């Protein structure tokens, strides 16, 4: 089997790499290599054993979409949530990447509902309790 591009791993980074190559008009033959099982064969024994038994590869994180395959698809839409990316590339650019990613998810059918938008009083109360506990509540968006 011949390929121009080999993407190792079909987690979010691998999936988005392939998508960006295609969206940017690449005519190259792309192969994705994944060590994990298909989604239908990814069963974690922890639900029965109540502890990790060290499957190799891990049935939660390895496989198409990684652990995201089992998530409900919610994204944090603010650069203030997560790691150090804004300090490396700037807040505006980090936010533009988040917005770009959200747009892709929406193009593929993600739910457009944004939680908490119409619950101003409830959010104020949660923010007050967070501040009292020494926490910062981040609006997303």
Task: Label each PLM-derived region with a short phrase.
Residues 7-9, 17, 73:
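Conserved structural-core and active-site-/substrate-pathway-adjacent residues in large, well-folded domains
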Residues 35-42, 46-141:
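Conserved N-terminal/central alpha/beta ligand/cofactor-binding core
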